[in-house]
Amino acid sequence: MLFALIQASAWATTYTFASGNYTTVTNFTACATGPCANYTTSMQTSGSFTTAAPLAANLANQNIFAQVTSFSLSDGIVTYSSADPNSRVYSFVVSTNAAGQITSSQIVLEEWQSTPHTPPSRVAILELIASTASAFNNTACTADTTSPAGVADTCTAAIVDASGSSAQSTVLTSNIPNVPTVGEWGLVCLAGCMLVLAWMRLRRRQIS
């Protein structure tokens, strides 16, 4: 039983997001600076994040960033990834139901698109808030401080100027978590549990 309990706590869980195709698109009018690019209505937001253990049930607007081990989401133009040194987390807040499934989110990710990360450096922003996915490419950052998630060097205010583009979908779904992945320690514990069960069965046979 002890091995089983340890194994359960070692599960990593992946949560996926997908929006509908963008229904509102506003593209740049004059590319004066930065990586200008156009969104289209055939694009959408999609991706996932992984936590070290399944999210708890009945969370209410809880900051879960400390539990996130990796993330990767794309808005059709920009990919936001925990493996990218230019990606930043502004907010990673979710709510869950009694089964631990995400019912609402306030996830805001950023990608620095120019240096030196001071106004008016260019930044892309992806917002997954409630049932809406909003994407912003090549915006002008107007403030660079520490985010509410505790991440330094994050753009905390930005404007969409003539070089920027934006897109939005009012359909956003978060899928039921994939089957948890057993980590290294989970495999060790599982093997230990199987050895204990085998020993107990052998012991019973010897006694009988």
Task: Label each region the model flagged.
Residues A32-D153, A157-I159:
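Predominantly extracellular/secreted and cell-surface proteins with exposed
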Residues S9, A56, G192-L195:
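N-terminal low-complexity, intrinsically disordered patches enriched in charged
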Residues Q206-S208:
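Cytoplasmic C-terminal tails of single-pass
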Residues F3-T13, S166-C189:
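Short, threonine-centered small-residue motifs that mark membrane-proximal processing/anchoring sites
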Residues E184-R204:
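A cross-kingdom C-terminal cell-surface attachment/processing module
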Residues T13-N27, Q67-V78:
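Tryptophan-anchored aromatic micro-motifs
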Residues V151-S174:
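A eukaryote-biased signal for long
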